[in-house]
Each structure stands twice: as C-alpha cells, then as structure tokens.
C-alpha cells in the first residue's frame, strides 16, 4: 500500500467543488493509498530528521462532511512513499523553510511532488525567462524609469508583483493613464522590490488558458478563464468565468516545448498560463483547475498524476 502525505491549507475551509488537492485525495483513496494529512505547522526538523504530526484521513464527495481524521501520529517523513506539497502561495520564507524540511525526507527516498529544490528555483513569473521566445515582451525591474520607458514603447502594458496569486495586484496601464507612477511605486515599494511588466495581450478577451502538464505530458484539455464585466484579469479568484476547452495547436507546441524541462526538474504537476499563443506564467506551487476540466471532458487528470507518481516510485 502506498503511503501518501499531503501538505495543504486547512482542509476544513476548502471548496471541494473546485479544489484540486481534494480531487487528488479522492483518486489516491480510490486506489487504496493510506492518506496522511499535514499543515505547515505540523512539519518539523529534529537533529536533521524531517518529521511531522500527521493525521490519517478519509475523504468523500459530500458537501456537508468531506473529510474525516481517522488517527493521529508523529512520524518520520521518510516513512511515507510520496508527499504532495500543495500549500498555496504566498511563496515566502516560511514556504522555503518547509521545502528544506521536505528535502531532508526526499534525500532519504520519499518522492516530493513537486521537487523542493525546483519549487525554490522556479519562480512562477520569472521561470518564463528561460523560454523568452514563447512569452510576451517582458521586463523585470525595480526601476520606475525603465517601467515608464517600457510603457511608452508599448503604450498598453500589464504590471504585476513576482509573488502574487489569483490575479492579486495585477494592473493594466493604457496609453495616457496618469496612474503609472503611483502603480510603479506601489508594486516596487519605491524601488525596493522587483516587479514584472509585459505588453498587454488583446487575446485575453478570449481567455487566460490554464494548461496542465503531468510529469512532462500535457493534459489534452485546458481551462480558459475569461475576464468578466470589463475586468482585465481572467483568474477565477478575480471573478473570471471558466470554460474548459481542448488544447489548440499553439498550446500543444508550448506545452511540449516546456514539458521535458519540467520533467527533468521533478516538477510533476504544473500549470502553464497561456494567453493567445504566448506563455505568461509557469505555476509550480499548487496548480489548480483539475475539477473544472474533469467535469467537462472524459479525462482523469488525477489518474494521470497518480500513474506518474506510481511510475516514479517503481524506478
């Protein structure tokens, strides 16, 4: 029996209709895995050994009672076969410390999804720089004058922090907008933090597509998140409407180009964000949209993921 751990935000407060971590737990349970639930505060390191308080867990598709803790124990993390790191951003120093704890278990043979070092190495915004021919024109800077010059060149740009999620603090600055200065000062905290600028992509009106990649293999369907009511952002957390779709030829090309790098880095479950034919983000911390896609198309993304985990465990 496979012993699967999961590190996540409190399960009591999730929305099971759209929670991808919950979908993973349902599939793992269906396969007979022993489930061990952890929150960040449960992880600890003692004399170099990674340990945790874990609670054994059962889950069910029931909107009134979707989980039950069936036991509690303190154990060495390397006694688990695999651990899903599904804590949502912010990707802060606490998150980084947790990856070091998980890495100690990884060194003793536990499979961590996604690989702790790669979670640290691959910032969701900056990692796109390694595939710059696939992205919009992109500037990463703290410098207000550089941001202004970029805006003057493109006349319609998107500004965003490097550590946000769900569309938080994303600004569109059009030609003639008097607010560029204050937005730049806010995002860079007066020149002390980096932010990202990209030229605005009109294709956003047709959706910001979330393309999932499982151990290097693209999932053939994506979720297009379409901005509503004059909003620039398609993120579901920002009120976007989700529309599952098959991948386009350009989606396939982008995902197949990046897939081998993701697989080599131990990034087993990743969400690419694509607008039109341009890559905008590579989400590695806790990508979502499984449930929306599975509800519309005859595919088990969680099945693909568990197959990939089992294949890696057999190596």
UniProtKB/Swiss-Prot annotation:
Which free-text remark accompanies the cofactor? Binds 1 magnesium or manganese ion per subunit.
Residues that coordinate or bind Mg(2+): 281, 283
Q: Which residues are glycosylated?
A: 256
Q: Name one GO molecular function term.
A: ATP binding
Sorted alphabetically, the keyword list is: ATP-binding, Glutathione biosynthesis, Glycoprotein, Ligase, Magnesium, Manganese, Metal-binding, Nucleotide-binding
Q: Which PROSITE patterns match?
A: ATP_GRASP
Write out the PTM section of this UniProt entry: Glycosylation at Arg-256 by NleB enhances the glutathione synthetase activity, leading to an increase in glutathione production. Glycosylation may promote C.rodentium survival in oxidative stress conditions.
- Can you give the residue ranges of the ATP-grasp domain? 125-310
Top-level division of the source organism's lineage = Bacteria
Q: What is this enzyme's EC?
A: 6.3.2.3
**Glycoprotein is among the record's keywords:** yes
**Record's NCBIfam families?**
glut_syn (TIGR01380), PRK05246.1 (NF003573)
Query: What's this protein's name?
Result: Glutathione synthetase
In which organism is this protein found? Citrobacter rodentium
Where is the organism placed in the taxonomic lineage, from the top?
Bacteria, Pseudomonadati, Pseudomonadota, Gammaproteobacteria, Enterobacterales
């Amino acid at each position: 029996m496979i012993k699967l751990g999961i590190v996540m935000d409190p399960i009591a407060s999730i929305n099971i209709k759209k929670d991808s971590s919950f979908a993973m737990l349902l599939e793992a349970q269906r396969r007979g895995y022993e489930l061990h639930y952890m929150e960040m505060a449960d992880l600890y390191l003692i004399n170099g050994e990674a340990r945790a308080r874990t609670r054994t867990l059962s889950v069910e598709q029931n909107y009134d009672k979707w989980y039950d803790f069936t036991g509690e124990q303190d154990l060495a993390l390397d006694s688990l076969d695999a651990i899903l790191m599904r804590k949502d951003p912010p990707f802060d120093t606490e998150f980084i410390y947790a990856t070091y704890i998980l890495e100690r278990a990884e060194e003793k043979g536990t499979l961590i999804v996604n690989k702790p070092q790669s979670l640290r190495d691959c910032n969701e915004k900056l990692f796109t720089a390694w595939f710059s021919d696939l992205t919009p024109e992109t500037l990463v800077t703290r410098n207000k004058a550089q941001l202004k010059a970029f805006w003057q060149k493109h006349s319609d740009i998107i500004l965003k922090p490097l550590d946000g999620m769900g569309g938080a603090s994303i600004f569109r600055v059009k030609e003639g907008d008097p607010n560029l200065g204050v937005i730049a000062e806010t995002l860079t905290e007066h020149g002390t933090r980096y932010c990202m600028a990209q030229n605005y992509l009109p294709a956003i009106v047709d959706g910001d597509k979330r393309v999932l990649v499982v151990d290097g293999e693209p999932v053939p369907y994506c979720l297009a998140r379409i901005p509503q009511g004059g909003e620039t952002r398609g993120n579901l957390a920002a009120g976007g409407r989700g529309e599952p779709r098959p991948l386009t030829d350009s989606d396939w090309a982008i995902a197949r180009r990046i897939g081998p790098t993701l697989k080599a880095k131990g990034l087993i479950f990743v969400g690419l964000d694509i607008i039109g034919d341009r890559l905008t983000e590579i989400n590695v911390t806790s990508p979502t949209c499984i449930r929306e896609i599975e509800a519309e198309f005859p595919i088990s993304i969680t099945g693909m993921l568990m197959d990939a985990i089992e294949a890696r465990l057999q190596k």
